[in-house]
Regions:
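Solenoid-repeat scaffolds in large eukaryotic assemblies
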Residues: 49, 56, 102-105
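Short terminal interaction segments
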Residues: 1-16, 99, 103-142
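Short, solvent-exposed, charged loop/turn and helix-capping segments
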Residues: 62-77
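Hydrophobic/aromatic side-chain positions at a characteristic register within alpha-helices
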Residues: 41, 94-97
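TPR repeat positional signature
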Residues: 26, 33, 82, 87-89
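Glycine/charge-rich, flexible interdomain linkers and switch-proximal surface loops
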Residues: 74-81, 130-131
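N-terminal first-folded block
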Residues: 15-49, 53
Length: 142
């Protein structure tokens, strides 16, 4: 009973969070996982590397599933290509245990995370001024 109530409460909290904050949180966690996987690779910690790489792939997959190609247009198409490439490189990283591949993905994702943080700031300002949300927000469906 308690677990069900807790889940309902968590779901209600998630619905109350603006979707852009969810995207920013996912990107932040993604970067943390990539960094942890790279560090684990350098330290020879195979299990940690695998767990963090798997988490990074799961996050990227969730971001890809959230793309709305109807509303997002070219932005959604480009993000999808980037996500596919990132998953491919992380898979290679896991097989080869080459930290340079993880760094490559980090360098690919970091500007996106920065852009989403900026969009979050713009969204806060826009909502305060009753202005329409940025186009990139329409590329994601949550």
């Amino acid at each position: 009973m308690y677990a069900r109530q807790s889940r309902v409460y968590q779901d209600a909290q998630l619905e109350a969070v603006p979707r852009i904050r969810v995207v920013v949180a996912l990107y932040d966690r993604l970067l943390t996982s990539i960094d942890a996987a790279e560090q684990a690779s350098r330290a020879g910690q195979i299990e940690v590397r695998y767990a963090e790489t798997s988490r990074a792939v799961e996050i990227i997959s969730a971001l890809a599933r959230a793309l709305d190609f109807n509303s997002g247009g070219e932005i959604a198409v480009h993000l999808d290509r980037i996500y596919r490439f990132a998953i491919q490189r992380l898979t290679e990283f896991e097989v080869r245990n080459d930290p340079a591949l993880a760094q490559q993905v980090r360098h690919l994702i970091d500007p996106l995370a920065t852009a989403w943080r900026q969009l979050e700031q713009e969204s806060v300002q826009a909502s305060a001024n009753n202005v329409e949300a940025p186009a990139a927000l329409r590329a994601m469906r949550f």
